[in-house]
A protein has these predicted regions:
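Sec-dependent signal peptide cleavage junction
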Residues: 65-80, 414, 418-422
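Substrate-binding/catalytic groove segments of enzymes
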Residues: 96-101, 120-127, 374-377, 405-409
Length: 422
């Protein structure tokens, strides 16, 4: 009995010993597995750090090589960029020597690139154009007491020559003799028809203009594409003939000429101005920037009175009286010439609205008064010209004249790709 009991206890002890041994082995395996996982994770982290380091070093090497290459390689500038460099160089030169600037608005002078190079205002032209042989100069014109226009001219053999805006428009490839387009007409180059590619804008503005014509002085006449935000009276002075304030159709002393002056200066709808302020009108979109104004010239706006039955289209009637200004309104004859309808004969022919890009849009004022009634002026009404009492209100589409020195930067004349003036 005792032997049996001892055997059972021995077997139980051996069994417990075996179980403890198995548990110990299991715990050891589990710890080893954890250690292996930690080791694998650490090895993976080290590999990723090495890979990340290699990528960073590679980027640094590539960027460093690019920088070193850039130090030893020249940038090739475009011709337009070189013209801008010439212009900036001339501005710097005359900041150093202001007494050399033109003294009057009638005076114009040229400064050659060789002078600008000698004065360290710019480098040799071939530096910018990788050895191309070019010559150039910058013309300086006085615009007002403190404003000057700087116009660069660059010629590089047969490869490139600065293009003036008027020459680009007058190019023979643009001319047509029928249909819509640019006509040689009465000694001028006139856009006629409905769908014509005569859109233009200044390089620093999105405001669109339409090219009306290139006149005999090579000034490009532009009219604002969209009409003004506000409606304005042409004139609302007391008229003795009618004993009321229906206005007088004398442009030189009219309210509209004064309004246009404010419009040109961007002073319509401002809070603190003495007139045409925000109590009367909403603020108009800025007409021209300071830089844009250096590219336009004062012109003789043709403001003579015209009768309803007048059939002339050469401007002789309207231009019998002129008003000098930087901004004006379209003369009637320019509207008539824009139509290619053969039935557009007199001032008020309804057919003049046909095949005429100028007939679109709001009712707008023209520059000319009626030849028969002193309180009536011409406006575009429903697409054609009609007599309107001067004290009525209409929108305006101002005109300006580009200097013959204004340049073409790019563009095709379409609404989406207009000619760009610089």
């Amino acid at each position: 009995m005792n032997n049996k009991l001892r055997n059972e206890k021995l077997e139980e002890a051996l069994e417990n010993d075996s179980t403890e041994k198995e548990n110990l082995e299991f715990e050891t395996d589990e710890e080893n597995e954890k250690d292996n996982k930690k080791l694998e994770q650490e090895q993976f982290r080290v590999k990723m750090l090495k890979l990340f380091g290699i990528v960073i070093i590679g980027l640094v090497v590539v960027l460093g090589l690019g920088f070193i290459i850039s130090l030893f390689s020249k940038k090739e500038y475009t011709y337009v960029e070189v013209e801008d460099i010439m212009k900036d160089a001339a501005i710097s030169y005359f900041e150093e020597y202001p007494k050399k600037l033109p003294a009057t608005t009638d005076e114009s002078l040229e400064v050659s690139t060789s002078i600008l190079i000698d004065n360290k205002n710019m480098k040799e032209i071939d530096h910018y154009l990788n050895g191309k042989s070019c010559k150039g100069n910058v013309t300086v014109d006085k615009i007002s007491s403190n404003e000057y226009a700087y116009t660069p001219y660059l010629k590089c053999g047969n490869d490139y020559e600065t293009t003036t805006f008027y020459n680009a428009i007058k190019n023979e490839k643009n001319l047509v003799t029928s249909g819509y387009g640019l006509y040689s007409y009465n000694g001028e180059y006139v856009y006629r028809g409905k769908n014509v590619d005569n859109y233009a804008r200044f390089s620093d503005s999105k405001r669109l203009f339409r090219i009306v014509k290139v006149n005999k002085d090579n000034e490009v006449v532009l009219i604002q594409d969209e009409s003004s935000d506000n409606e304005y009276p042409w004139d609302d002075r007391y008229n003795k003939v009618y004993d009321d304030n229906s206005g007088i159709n004398d442009y030189k002393n009219s309210k509209i000429s004064d309004i246009l002056s404010y419009y040109y200066k961007g002073k319509i709808g401002l809070e603190n101005d003495d007139k045409y302020n925000y109590y009367e009108y909403s603020k108009e979109v800025k007409f021209l920037t300071k830089e844009d104004r250096t590219k336009i010239v004062k012109f003789k706006n043709c403001v003579g009175r015209r009768s309803e039955n007048d059939t002339s289209k050469d401007g002789s009637v309207e231009c019998s009286s002129t008003y000098d200004s930087e901004i004006g309104l379209l003369p009637v004859y320019d509207f008539l010439n824009a139509s290619i309808d053969p039935n557009c004969i007199t001032t008020v022919s309804p057919s003049c609205q046909n095949y005429n890009y100028l007939s679109d849009g709001d009712s707008t004022w023209f520059a000319n008064g009626s030849g028969s009634e002193t309180n009536e002026v011409y406006s575009m009404y429903l697409g054609y010209i009609a007599n309107t009492e001067a004290s009525e209100t209409n929108n305006i589409r101002p005109i300006i004249h580009l200097s013959e020195k204004a340049m073409l930067e790019k563009g095709k004349g379409t609404k989406n790709n207009p000619y760009v003036i610089r």
